[in-house]
Amino acid sequence: MAPSSHRSGVVQPLPPDAPRRAPESKTKVSGDAENEEQPLLQASEPENVHKSEIDRASSIIKRLNLLRMTRAKGLGFIVFAGLNFSFASICIKYASHRVTSHETVFWRMVIALVLNYIWARYKKRKLVVESKYRGLLLLRCVVGTVGVNLQFYAMSKMVLTDAIVIVSTSPISTFFLGAAFLKEKINQVDLLAGITSFIGVMFVTRPAFLFASDTITKQAPPLATYCAIGASLTSAVVYILLRQLSKVDCLVSIHYFFVVGTCTSIVTLLVMKVSMTILLEPIFLFALFGSGFFSFIGQIFITKGFQLEQAGIASVMRYFDVVFVVAMDVLVLGEMVSLLSLLGAGIIMAGVSMIVLRRAREQ
């Protein structure tokens, strides 16, 4: 009799001697181990994007803070350079009473060249300039040398304070030259600070068309005044060139400036038929050495300062030179400085302080 169809669904027990099938082992699909280590809730894509934006923003903030610290350091370098240049000006003024301005330029260049070469060798710097910077460096050396000669002649014939402040009018020109050639943005506050300092310069120089004649101070020769103005214009050009040479090592740039200056001063001595005079007086010898030594230190820090800061803003800090010179004019040289000169020095400091305080608030 055939089995009925409803019995086909009944499970029959296995006979005792039938082989038992081993239980299936739970094998992990590839990737399960990695999935176990992952968090239960995956971060969504917008959250990852948000994190990357935060990281990018923090990186930008760090770079901006570093840039601000670097620029603040550049301002400090320029102020310290101004202090050294004021010492050099005192030495030059004293030496000019004994020798000509051409001799003073020669000794200043030679002494500074020797000191810079020794320091460059000590720092193991190669005095080699890339070909793309040689033209700009040559122009910087020539213009700078012309400016130094004009400045030295003006300082030897004028009251030191008046000569220095006329030379220090260069920042106003530098602001506009920097905007034209370096594409530097002119900040309104910084420009206002420069104009304020320039007003202070006017109080110190007291031009005849604005001020009555001052009987206390002596009248400067017209040629000396023109030389001081020429030194101011050449300084503005040099500041722009220093910014364009920011990739050149400062010791290398200074070295060739002193080389060109030394060669030019030798040619000037020969053409002008100046007989060299060396007085063996300790104070005079110190003045000659100091004119080179302090100029060397000042050139290092002013070059580094202009490589770090915008040309227009950095040049305004050169107004601090006037404050140093006014103090040394009275204390060291004993020259008469009018109350208007002191008022002008105060106005200059006010203009410079506007820039310094802005930099401090950025930190």
Predicted features, each with a name:
Residues 212-274:
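Transmembrane alpha-helical segments that form core, pore/gating elements
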Residues 107, 163-169, 248-260, 296-330:
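Helix-helix packing/entry segments at the starts of transmembrane helices
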Residues 2-83, 97, 113-139, 212-220, ...:
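Membrane-interface interhelical linkers
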Residues 74-80, 131-142, 186-199, 221-226, ...:
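Cytoplasmic-side transmembrane-helix entry/capping segments in multi-pass membrane proteins
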Residues 83-112, 237-260:
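Juxtamembrane helix-loop-helix junctions in multi-pass membrane proteins
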Residues 82-86, 90, 117, 141-149, ...:
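Hydrophobic/small/kink-forming positions within alpha-helical transmembrane segments
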Residues 167, 183-203, 207, 224, ...:
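Loop-to-transmembrane alpha-helix entry segments
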Residues 2-13, 55, 319-363:
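C-terminal-most transmembrane helix of multi-pass membrane proteins
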